[in-house]
Amino acid sequence: QMTSELAWRVAAEESEEMQKIRENVITLIVPVMNPDGLDIVVDWYRKNLGTPFENTSPPILYQKYVGHDNNRDWFMNNMPETYNVTKILYNEWYPQIVYNHHQSSPSWTKISIPPYADPVNPKIHPAITAAVSEVGSAMSKRFSLENMPGAIADNFYTMFWNGGGRTVPYYHNMIGILTETGHTTPTPRFYDPEKLPKTV
């Protein structure tokens, strides 16, 4: 999974860029918020690999009480996972950027990034809104420089709702970033170019 590779790169990669990051940035990594749920999803995929059910979701909740909705519990903190992470974010470390890595992106894309679509909640400080868009623009530029197509922005997420892992940080004067990557399973997919959305 991506977080394991990221942790290794931050700790061991000797590129000039990563050395500079290590010297100037404190990075906290939560490898997975719901390890039991990850195991359920992985086991279901492996069990059904090569069958008509290969790209389906498990027929059970992958969190005993809330299923996937533990990622919508960031303002109520009903679940131990969100309670513990928010304690770290808002009472112990106070990070400048909170990055919430999700999957899956819209079916024909590789990653969705900020800037986000309108509307923006008027309770969010304009400097936070601008900073989120600035980080998204830097991400887009880097994808272009690395010749990595498939990134989209200004799509289906807004900055209005205030209950997600990306949006609650706004009210603590932190930059909240959410990306959605790939699709729901590791199985490669082909998307017919004729069926992709056309630009105007």
Description of each model-found segment:
Residues 1-134, 141-145:
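Active-site/substrate-binding loop(s) of hydrolase catalytic cores
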